């Protein structure tokens, strides 16, 4: 048989079903912080359903619980861990440039007032 005439054969890989992220005993509630915190990113954003591997109903309930927890100040809207790092050469140059612009504006305004 010709190589081009052979049927395409897929390799048989073993398929291991992943455990669902939410077990049947878990209650999706704004007070269940250990459960809710698993579905929030490093920056404090709610992860998508595709990343979480949740059903539509579970994702909706998780989103509502996270929003309720944020409103009740149980969860921050943004993570505090996301801090400004030390300045680099690029940021220093940018700061210097903006300071020069501000100084030029002040001089221009002073000269304008004198006239």
Curated annotation (Swiss-Prot):
The keyword Ribonucleoprotein applies. One of its GO terms (molecular function) is structural constituent of ribosome. Belongs to the bacterial ribosomal protein bS18 family. Keywords: Chloroplast, Plastid, Ribonucleoprotein, Ribosomal protein, RNA-binding, rRNA-binding. It comes from Ipomoea purpurea. It is found in: Plastid, Chloroplast. NCBIfam families: S18. The lineage of its organism: Eukaryota, Viridiplantae, Streptophyta, Embryophyta, Tracheophyta. Its main location: plastid. Residues 99-109 have a biased composition (Basic and acidic residues). This is Small ribosomal subunit protein bS18c. One of its GO terms (cellular component) is mitochondrial small ribosomal subunit. InterPro entries: Ribosomal_bS18, Ribosomal_bS18_CS, Ribosomal_bS18_sf. Residues 91-115 are annotated as: Disordered. Part of the 30S ribosomal subunit. SUPFAM superfamilies: Ribosomal protein S18. GO terms for biological process: translation.
